[in-house]
Design a protein with these regions (language model features):
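ATP/NTP phosphate-donor binding region
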Residues: 1-85
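Short secondary-structure boundary/capping segments
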Residues: 2-3, 78, 103, 139-142
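Short glycine-/acidic-enriched loop or helix-start segments at secondary-structure transitions
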Residues: 40-43, 97-99, 123
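Short, glycine/charged-enriched secondary-structure capping and boundary segments
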Residues: 44-48, 68-69, 101-104, 126-129, ...
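Hydrophobic, well-ordered secondary-structure scaffolds
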Residues: 68-73, 91, 103-104, 119-123
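A short, small-residue-rich loop immediately preceding and capping a beta-strand
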Residues: 81-101, 105-117
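A glycine/threonine-rich phosphate-anchoring loop and its flanking beta-alpha core
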Residues: 106-155
Length: 155
């Protein structure tokens, strides 16, 4: 396993990288997935204590404010506070949406990216750029915010 220090967060790469999923003393934890990552990847994560699973539809057409509203509603429904964590398990849409929603919910909660596609591993999960599409234009609303860590599982 290899650790890369990027700005102020670690990027863990390797077959044992999921062991670096540090949820610390967060008050609540949610995992953002789509139907594909829920089916194929969620079971690979280490067991977490009572995580909330937030499932959105897969595809670029769902990377919008309506989906953000759904994510924010779920976080609110489950009483997430500023000491909560959102784990983004998926490709570029999940990383962009999850990071954007976490960074804007209650003026920012922590998030961790666990990218599941090569493009997300090389682009969407690193660099801190987060955005959603608006009026059918890509990444029209966004911001820059870094995750607590990026975990790239290679097994």
């Amino acid at each position: 396993m290899k650790e890369i220090i990027a700005s102020n967060y670690s990027i863990w790469i390797g077959e044992n990288s999921l062991s670096k999923l540090n949820v610390g003393s967060y008050s609540k934890i949610a995992i953002l997935v789509d139907e594909n990552t829920k089916r194929d990847c969620l079971s690979k994560l280490p067991k977490l204590e009572n995580p909330i699973i937030i499932e959105i539809q897969s595809g670029e057409e769902y990377k919008n404010l309506a989906t953000c509203d759904f994510i924010w509603q779920e976080l609110t429904k489950h009483n997430f506070d500023r000491n909560s964590l959102l784990i983004n398990l998926g490709g570029g849409v999940i990383c962009d949406m999850g990071g954007f929603c976490a960074s804007t919910y209650k003026r920012g909660i922590d998030f961790i990216h666990i990218p599941t596609t090569l493009l997300a591993m090389a682009d969407a999960s690193i660099g801190g750029k987060l955005g959603v599409d608006f009026n059918h234009l890509k990444n029209q609303i966004g911001l820059f915010a870094n995750p607590k860590s990026v975990i790239i599982y290679t097994k």
